[in-house]
Amino acid sequence: MGRAISKSGPVRALGAMSGTSLDGVDVAVLETDGRDILGFGETGYRAYSDAEREVLRAALGQWTGDAVAAAARVVEAAHIEVMTDHADVDLIGFHGQTVAHAPRLQGTLQVGDGGVLAEALGRPVVWDFRSDDVSMGGEGAPLAPFFHHACARYIGATEPLCFLNLGGVGNVTYVDPRKARPEDEGALLAFDTGPANAPINDFLQSRLGLAMDEGGRIASGGAVENGALELFLAEPYFARMPPKSLDRNDFPEMIGLVTELSDADATATLTAMCAAAVAQGMEHCPKAPSKVLVTGGGRHNPVLMEMLRVSLDCPVEPVETVGLDGDMLEAQAFAYLAVRVARGLPTSAPSTTGVRACVGGGTVTVPEGWTARKT
């Protein structure tokens, strides 16, 4: 019914990511041995409908209950729908949808059952990537840094650089590609910089019924309210040393800081908050990066990108400038991490999540009738 996963050699894996922006499900095929990127495959996307997005929003911040169960059903159905056309793979990496994240309480919840996907798609599924990290004292996020290290080596980078993901929450990975393995000392530093697209999207949804500030058009017509920006940057999170991570809803007062402003001024100020959080976070890098490669939806916002270029003392470019796909990098990351889990390789380290020791987190669910894995 399918190939077993051997101890070495290439594996064709399908990764899926449903991020904190709640826009939809990204899926991407990657060929890897769990260490190096051997090739990129096809990609797919399935947007959430407005009704589905409201179901997901209702579950945010919840750990149990009917809202969480309803969100899980939405996530599973959407993933199965988009994955069906890309399931000719050896292995699937399924992140699920984060609805609650409280690492200081040793809790993180990504809804969606990998077992449901395994049976529906007839492929082994690696899922629940974050729980082991959190149980060992880690933040459980970000998890893409090990893949970022592989990307840096894939593009032939020779000097330290940063990958900046601007989804609902922003996170940055400092990579030294001269280190052979992502778990090597000094290879990586990673953390969440602060809120990114989520508060902008939430504000525009509540004020104007818009899903996002497409092309930065609304922010471009506004002025930044510096008083609100200063209050935002006084939040204790920004004084914490990395590694550190955020839940999508950890800054509920952000929108309150801009509610008295015009639509354009409020959007410009929220955008500036994202850029300022990144700039402040970048001060933690061991040395100035040679460049910052931006991934995630935020790179499509020219106002935000220009704010970053002004704030950071190095080139700021979308990842497409080095041949990578900024819309699919997170999905590709979970394909890569799935293979690492299947082969017993670590997926996070003290320098990326604050976990006590390198850990390979994830549950592997094999569908009935699948050839036994050989690991």
Curated annotation (Swiss-Prot):
Coiled coil: none annotated. SUPFAM superfamilies: Actin-like ATPase domain. Keywords: ATP-binding, Carbohydrate metabolism, Kinase, Nucleotide-binding, Transferase. The keyword Kinase applies. Pathway: Amino-sugar metabolism; 1,6-anhydro-N-acetylmuramate degradation; Cell wall biogenesis; peptidoglycan recycling. GO terms for molecular function: ATP binding; kinase activity; phosphotransferase activity, alcohol group as acceptor. GO terms for biological process: 1,6-anhydro-N-acetyl-beta-muramic acid catabolic process; amino sugar metabolic process; peptidoglycan turnover. It comes from the Bacteria. InterPro entries: Anhydro_N_Ac-Mur_kinase, ATPase_NBD. It catalyses: 1,6-anhydro-N-acetyl-beta-muramate + ATP + H2O = N-acetyl-D-muramate 6-phosphate + ADP + H(+). Its EC number is 2.7.1.170. ATP binds at G19, T20, S21, L22, D23, G24, V25, D26. Belongs to the anhydro-N-acetylmuramic acid kinase family. PANTHER family: ANHYDRO-N-ACETYLMURAMIC ACID KINASE (PTHR30605:SF0). Catalyzes the specific phosphorylation of 1,6-anhydro-N-acetylmuramic acid (anhMurNAc) with the simultaneous cleavage of the 1,6-anhydro ring, generating MurNAc-6-P. Is required for the utilization of anhMurNAc either imported from the medium or derived from its own cell wall murein, and thus plays a role in cell wall recycling. This is Anhydro-N-acetylmuramic acid kinase. It comes from Ruegeria sp. (strain TM1040) (Silicibacter sp.). The lineage of its organism: Bacteria, Pseudomonadati, Pseudomonadota, Alphaproteobacteria, Rhodobacterales.
